[in-house]
Amino acid sequence: VIVQLASPTLEIDDDPEAFFQLSLAEGWGDGAPLLPPTDERVAALLEATALAPSHTIGKLPPRHGAATVELIAINAAMAGVEPAAFPLVIAALEALVRPEFNAIALTTTTSSVHPTLIVNGPSRDKLRIDYQAGCLGGAAGRGSMTIGRAVSLCLRNVGGQRTGATSRSVFGQPARFGQCFAEWEERSPWPTLAERQGFARDRDVVTLHGSKGNFPVADTNNDDPRDLAYMLAKCIAYPLSNYYLELTGDCGQIVVVINPMWAARFAKAFATLESFQEYLREHAWQPIELWRPANQEVLRKKNRVDARGRVHLVNRPEQLVPVVAGGLGSLHAMFLPSWCQSEMQSAAVHGATWTAELLDAALDEARTLVRSDGADLLLVEADPAAGRVVLRLEVGDETCATGACVMPGEALRPMIADVLSRRLRGALDLQLIDPRRG
């Protein structure tokens, strides 16, 4: 690994059951077996990112634990994340800690809300993130299961989310184990979700949505796509949605997962994605008479009832977010309602730029500048994302005990920086610690 790990280590029996029992006793897990986060597993994950293990992504709620890359890697190792998928886990947490996602409220509410990860980009298949039949459960893609689980474990073990204590969720939901799926981009007639967020189509992007659950919709009767869209809108506007608890419907987003067969039909009936979204918004309402008197009173006080006695769910069409995924069986859609307190967030995935092998080779060459004088260079820290390396000059050879024969640090530094910049193929911020300087 690039630097020595800071986390303490434990020695236990080489038995999966032993670690499983330990994880249950310590409260690290979610009730399902975990993989032991061995040095080898954690190191393999760390080599997949350009970030230093000590780099902090942010503070994870609810207890504001510092999410260092090392701690994220430990939890990802327990979840079974493959090294190639680790940068996606980091990107998801980068999105999660943004204030707009409001993760502190999400992790402590009585609601069942939990982050859902939606992935776009060319790595979907390589990482085995499901987007066809069974993509929201049952397809068994390793990426789908482990990436979402890693984020949940980080909230538990780094953020301190504990059911019944810091988390007051009344019911929870299956997605609290972890929910991650991808968009079936090749079957979508519209720009991808990532493109709509401003990313290029060839970028790997993860989008976080605060989802209250997965609500299935089925229609075996309507052949007309506009009638189908009408019924879909009515289902989304269910009477006790969180949107009807707010002063306005101008909050959060609702993800509408549409199977490829329905998506093709909607694309023929509506000229653009925006016109389809506007049609859904226009018909996502219920008559005020649907509610009981106590509900009606609150809705009227909040000025949610229009002149025709309709209560619209959302204010803007872009709050209804179609995503194409699922099998080819048609007949079904799924919508993921928001709890209205989180704004959907997207982040690009960044892989490693310096591998451990590349850095080791660069350091080996740099060490030749001082070893002939009986000195050495010790790596203290490396942060590829920031282009920063911290080295310590070690003088220990008895023939040069005072270090007088070794060039001063201020003279050595530009020579070492030149070697590292050339081997690492980029500008470098080098700090050289010379213990001979008081």
Predicted regions and their residues:
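Non-transmembrane, aqueous-exposed alpha-helical and coiled segments at domain scale
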Residues: 1-350
